[in-house]
């Protein structure tokens, strides 16, 4: 994942607008509209809600992500998997590591589940703007869903081509989008300048006082203004910290100006169906259609950023052995971090369209949205408390605690959405979560069941067989570690006497750093036996074939183990099916098929 050090001050900000802020940037399309369908837009309520929005964005985006989380990068990388790796390095062992690991599993699963709902609500809400065009008022809900689904299908269908060619346009389009949000909001707010007083937190407190428990549950809708805030930290590796934080200052002002404008419009037009579209149409009817086109483009860019983010999260999960191996294609020759995972892409597309068909309207989706986001924010907060409490900046742990308690309060408020479909967040997140749990446990159990042989014992038999006369050429054998020998190698060399003039044990170890590749060739472990260790960061795209050539290893044949799992346990059966459906190690690393030789080992689990 490259840092773009050559970007200008403005260039870095514009790029960040296109890559990072799409999700949070499209929140004004539906946030206040949804809130004021549930809460009467009286002057007091509008002031209270606008105050809550300001402080929600300040605490849960500016403080939690732009300040606290972004101070915890590893070589510029961010995200919950990175936090997990930081904790594992700081804490080393014990229950805290296991707890942090479990939290990261839940956090990653929530983000992946959320990646289904976010494109669905963004695209649907934009398409619903067609209803304000004269002559299109009668469009049925089914027609709107069909248009939204067609846009989603088009977006997912071009993923395999990569976004290299069009990505340069994302930033300027989103800059225009945020500029438009700021101007339209400011124009509306100008008719009632005192609306700026909504920043005062006393208005938010008064809202809770006047509305009681119902006021608290409104937080489950207010949080919609901060969805996508986690992208600041998760996407840090693409651009670096500074351009993202600088861009956030502009985005914050643009978003809040628009919310202020919508608040004024809501007071004057309490029956408006969509506050953003209604406000823009009332200001400049002739420019409404161009604005709607810009809105749809912004939601497509936001969805694209989410899809790319999912590819990145899943790749991190694969390399850190949380998720099964999947076919990975590189869509850019210049930027190695631009990847495409077909299985993830099509699964995500089916899930997004399914959610559109289930909920049919953006307001229905909004009623179910927010549980995963607030859960993820709470988990990030807990993990930051663990990290800061183990560093010299322990005072930050107290700040993180306050932020986490606030995030948790929002999360609890979203439980009121369960009857309205929020359970879909749990269902969607449970799919990656169950996969992670079964895959990680299955790998550990399988490794123990394989009973690898220690190197010293193996060498006694190896030396005797080598003395009888090896086959010409070089044979490569993939092993998990260089000091233990897996059963398939024992079967190959000791039992079947398949031994070459040069035999190389290759092990790929994942380091606790995100980037960097180091290799070590250990010669003469035994007669004609070398070991080749590769240690790579968990964000690295490792080209094993290139590394072999660089170290003068010219293979004749590549051996690898294939486990034939026998089990009655339903969990391990699912694990076995996952292993069969997904590529094996050598296929994942695209090693030449003509030289591959799989050796089957039967394993009881």
Curated annotation (Swiss-Prot):
The chain crosses the membrane at residues 16-36, 49-69, 97-117, 138-158, 170-190, 212-232, 247-267, 287-307, 339-359, 368-388, 397-417, 418-438. GO terms for cellular component: membrane; plasma membrane. InterPro entries: K+_transporter, K_trans_C, K_trans_N, Kup. GO terms for molecular function: potassium ion transmembrane transporter activity; symporter activity. It is found in: Cell inner membrane. Keywords: Cell inner membrane, Cell membrane, Ion transport, Membrane, Potassium, Potassium transport, Symport, Transmembrane, Transmembrane helix, Transport. It is a multi-pass membrane protein. One of its GO terms (biological process) is potassium ion transport. It catalyses: K(+)(in) + H(+)(in) = K(+)(out) + H(+)(out). Transport of potassium into the cell. Likely operates as a K(+):H(+) symporter. Belongs to the HAK/KUP transporter (TC 2.A.72) family. This is Probable potassium transport system protein Kup 3. It comes from Geobacter sulfurreducens (strain ATCC 51573 / DSM 12127 / PCA).
